[in-house]
């Protein structure tokens, strides 16, 4: 098992995500200014303490908490969330697995890039 990411690595990745996603829920597009929001792990933290889980490509800002808003939707509608790229399996690579955002399908990289995905997406 890989070691846990240090606090500095976690904060750096979260800073990248906040800069990339701004004040907008990446699922519904709602403004997150003065609204509850959270940073969602596409590949769940419960899958081990790997430092890979704190990569910016694995993290995305959503409205709500794990039980409310879009974050709650992802946690309660796991099959649909998986089809749309919001939840990943243990072997899925967050950098190459697209997700359906409010403005189309995108891939995310670890440097803060958000790239339109032109490949085949699930129906």
Briefly describe each language-model feature range.
Residues 1-13, 117-123:
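Arg/Lys-rich, low-complexity, intrinsically disordered N-terminal tails that contact nucleic acids
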Residues 10-38, 61-66:
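Short cysteine-rich loop/turn motifs with clustered Cys
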Residues 30-33, 56-83:
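Short Cys/His-centered divalent metal-binding micro-motifs
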Residues 43-59:
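Short linker/helix segments within small regulatory modules
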